[in-house]
Amino acid sequence: MAAGEVKSVLFVCLGNICRSPIAEAVFRKLVTDEKVENKWRIDSAATSTYEIGNPPDYRGQTCMKKHGITMNHIARQVTKDDFQTFDYILCMDESNLRDLKRKSNQVKDCKAKIELLGAYDPQKQLIIEDPYYGNEKDFETVYEQCVRCCKAFLEKPH
């Protein structure tokens, strides 16, 4: 990455209240710890409209607090602008990927590279499963996957 150049990443899941806000918060902490937060624009969004305006799921917030990470995101839906302004759009599962690819085809000048966040997992867990209908342990699994994937993503040359 050239000196002074700001890169951008948008984390996406179905509702933007479980997986993507966890990934966003984890990545924010990583770039802050590495003292490169001024080199990144970071956000998260949903493919659906189900949860727009809502805070992250309380179980995800509890999990993140346990790890000393605060979340202050409010759910929003992916916009056409996102495809033109973010360098990377990283999503959680095949359904997100399909929805994003379909939406990106309707956008002129899509500059975003759309990928699964799990593609960066050193443990090769490609899919980050939705913990919404699960329990605290499922949120912890999402957190652990996001830490592994976000670290690997941050370490790659951009």
From Swiss-Prot:
Active site location: C13 (nucleophile), R19, D130 (proton donor)
CDD domains attached to this UniProt entry: LMWPTP
Residue numbers carrying Phosphotyrosine: Y132, Y133
UniProt catalytic activity: O-phospho-L-tyrosyl-[protein] + H2O = L-tyrosyl-[protein] + phosphate; a phosphate monoester + H2O = an alcohol + phosphate
Alphabetized Gene3D superfamilies for the sequence: 3.40.50.2300
Documented EC number(s): 3.1.3.48, 3.1.3.2
SUPFAM superfamilies xref list: Phosphotyrosine protein phosphatases I
Keywords in alphabetical order: Acetylation, Cytoplasm, Hydrolase, Phosphoprotein, Protein phosphatase
GO CC field: cytoplasmic side of plasma membrane; cytosol; sarcolemma
Entry-linked PANTHER family: LOW MOLECULAR WEIGHT PHOSPHOTYROSINE PROTEIN PHOSPHATASE (PTHR11717:SF7), LOW MOLECULAR WEIGHT PROTEIN TYROSINE PHOSPHATASE (PTHR11717)
Protein name: Low molecular weight phosphotyrosine protein phosphatase
Organism: Gallus gallus
Phylogenetic classification of the source organism: Eukaryota, Metazoa, Chordata, Craniata, Vertebrata
